[in-house]
Amino acid sequence: MLTGPDGQQNQVFLTPQELQQWQARQQQQQQQPGQQAPGGAPRPPPAQVQPNLAPVEGVLDTEAKGPNAFLRQIRRNLLPGPEDAEIPKNLVQKLRLRQGQYLTAMAQMRGQKGLVQKVDTVDGQPVEGAPRLPHFNDLTSIDPVERIKLEHGHREMVTRVLDLIAPLGKGQRALIVSPPKAGKTIMLQRIAQAVLANHPEIHVMVLLIDERPEEVTDMRRSIKAEVLASSSDRATGDHLKVAELALERARRMVESGKDVMILLDSITRLARAFNKEVDSSGRTLTGGVDSRALERPKRIFGAARATEEAGSLTIVGTALIDTGSRMDEVIFEEFKGTGNSEITLDRLLAEKRIFPAINIPQSGTRKEEKLFTQKEYEKVKKLRQMLFSVKPVEAMEALVKRLSRYTYNDEFLDEL
């Protein structure tokens, strides 16, 4: 504490380096009488203003090189930016922080950038006294048993049909298999809108990889969810950074007990990006796909699960087929069967402007009986048997026509 000219005591904030510099100046001043304070005493160190602290927040990225980690901004799609606050990695280790956690903190500002001095909250919880959370990979995976209701309007046929043909549960790993221009993006939008309307407890994230910039804009304007995108005008490395940090963010939320849904468009383009960036293993599959290129995309898609001890992660991803690319076919074949729900879109249905363009015989959810009541399951089973006997185009036309007569799916099933 120092006594100022007004007689008040002021607290001084000096770094060790600044203190050494001040002490060196005092030694020089003691040798120069003209530099001494009245009475011959050394002049006190100048009062230091308290550091310029400001609140900062963001998603923790510990993978950056150097002594500091960074707080990435959602509005910048989790990509590096000039205003990202830095946080010393020794502080990260001290607080046992994990990649992808959302932090609020106080930082000493240096222009636009800040250096975190104190962490206040981690994923919405006070950092002091916060319970130790389990690690995602240590959680027990179970079959989805809690249904995600998508039906949310008489005229929303996409979600009403999905509820009957390929229902989703919390922790589902669903693959939308789609040829070009079959309506996969519209389907993702409808799913997002339904979940936001019916399940406010689910945190919805939309992850767009290598999409056209105008598609990104349309998605952001269509749904009020967290949209993270690396559009087609970005570097391939950006696609990987966004996808992997978004996954880590979702995993941390699940560890803290939250239910999360990621809508990923598309797995095919994500796999292409990894194929381009991965170090060559020396072994190339058909279509020019490196044998190691699909490991990380599979890890991302395979993260979807329901857990016993914590929350759930639902992933609905799209896979492209009939693009004329042998690589895309190989990617689809590698992912086929890795999910526990599959929705196949039909080009012929789309060309006839029949939406949703779902191929009913090729679509469905494994162990769907766990998502329906016994009565519902018997009715849905009967419906599938009826529709299976006709061609896909006729089946979807008939289903949409019948559904339009009823306000709710339950009313429709009761009449079967």
Question: What are the residue ranges of the model-derived segments?
Answer:
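P-loop NTP-binding catalytic core
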Residues: 109-176
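Short, structured beta-strand/loop micro-motifs enriched in basic residues and often containing a Trp
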Residues: 80-89, 152-158
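Short, charged beta-turn/beta-strand-edge "cap" motif at the junction between a beta-strand
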Residues: 91, 107-112, 180-181
